[in-house]
Swiss-Prot record:
UniProt keyword annotation of Manganese present: no
Stated role: Acts as an anti-CsrA protein, binds CsrA and prevents it from repressing translation of its target genes, one of which is flagellin. Binds to flagellin and participates in the assembly of the flagellum.
Highest rank taxon of the organism: Bacteria
Subunit-structure text: Interacts with translational regulator CsrA and flagellin(s).
An example Gene Ontology biological process: bacterial-type flagellum assembly
Signal sequence segment: none
Keyword Nucleus assigned: no
Family under the similarity heading: Belongs to the FliW family.
Family matches, as InterPro entries: Flagellar_assembly_factor_FliW, Flagellar_assmbl_FliW_dom_sf
Gene Ontology terms: cellular component: cytoplasm
Keywords, comma-separated and alphabetical: Bacterial flagellum biogenesis, Chaperone, Cytoplasm, Translation regulation
Protein location: Cytoplasm
Record's protein name: Flagellar assembly factor FliW
Length: 145
């Protein structure tokens, strides 16, 4: 099926749709998303809304940012996302890229997006740790691509 997004018109297969039952904080009214890869922005990917073409969030693999990144998914979240196989789980961190000032980009390592790729279910979880912040300057890290 074709969808209009901020990144242009894209073709999304049914198995590429990710449902966020409670939305994403700040976008609670939106439930259907997909992850889009653009060659020009790698390693940054895009979590695009399939319900509001103006919403697309830049995301990145947190282990590219911090190779020692640690995440513990609660039993409650495992149950909610119906995770049976941890190998089928994707984790992304949301980036904030200030308009006109990409050098000030921050990454949210405290509240990653967790997706059960097998079931197409996603959720932004908040890690129970003080180790990570909601706004880490991306420039503080050396990339581990």
């Amino acid at each position: 099926m074709k969808y209009n997004t901020r990144l242009g018109e894209i073709e999304i297969n049914e198995n590429e749709i990710i449902t966020f039952e409670k939305g994403i904080p700040g976008f609670e009214h939106l439930r259907k998303f997909s992850v889009i890869s653009l060659k020009d922005t790698l390693p940054i990917l895009w979590l695009v809304s399939l319900e509001d073409e103006n919403v697309s969030l830049p995301i990145i693999d947190p282990w590219i940012v911090d190779k020692n990144y640690e995440i513990e998914i609660s039993n409650e979240d495992i149950k909610e996302l119906e995770i049976e196989d941890k190998e089928k789980v994707a984790v992304w961190a949301i980036l904030t890229i200030p308009s006109g000032h990409p050098e000030e980009t921050t990454v949210n390592l405290r509240a990653p997006i967790v997706i059960n790729m097998e079931k197409g279910k996603g959720k932004q979880i908040i890690l129970d740790t003080e180790k990570y912040k909601i706004k880490h300057k991306l420039s503080e890290f050396s990339f581990q691509e």
